[in-house]
């Protein structure tokens, strides 16, 4: 899929991304865009004036159907797995587990208290100092 650039304002139409605001979904080929279409940024140039920049393959078309697809625009991660909710649940569980491990400390009476890492470090330092004085 190729990229096309407006010679006036440098707007780039990427076939992989499409132009949803103009009604062109991702993977819309340049040939599918009407001839009367004009640059959405400057409206000065018509489709025929655009210059082809490159012919890269979209990540979507190169990957197998069940491979996750990662788009780096705005740090958005999308995946094409048949069960994306399972992956999301696993990530949430892992993140929660890491968070709990980092933020919680067991007290002698088995109550769980939330502590920042700096509080935990200070408490452990105090314990070391007390043990060294004995």
UniProtKB/Swiss-Prot annotation:
Residues 1-53 form the Rubredoxin-like domain. Its cofactor is Fe(3+). GO terms for biological process: alkane catabolic process. Disulfide bonds: none annotated. Fe cation binds at residues 6, 9, 39, 42. It comes from Pseudomonas putida. InterPro entries: Rubredoxin-like_dom, Rubredoxin_dom, Rubredoxin_ET, Rubredoxin_Fe_BS. This is Rubredoxin-2.
């Amino acid at each position: 899929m190729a990229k096309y650039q407006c010679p006036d304002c440098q707007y780039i139409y990427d076939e992989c991304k499409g132009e949803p605001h103009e009604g062109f979904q991702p993977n819309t080929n340049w040939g599918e865009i009407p001839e009367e279409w004009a640059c959405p940024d400057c409206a000065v140039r018509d489709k025929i004036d655009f210059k082809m920049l490159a012919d890269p393959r979209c990540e979507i078309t190169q990957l197998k159907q069940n491979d996750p697809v990662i788009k780096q625009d705005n740090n958005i991660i999308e995946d094409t797995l048949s069960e994306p909710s399972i992956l999301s649940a696993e990530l949430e569980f892992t993140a929660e587990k890491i968070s709990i491990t980092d933020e919680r400390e067991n007290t002698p009476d088995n109550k769980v208290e939330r502590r920042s890492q700096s509080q935990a470090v200070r408490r452990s330092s105090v314990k070391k100092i007390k043990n060294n004085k004995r």
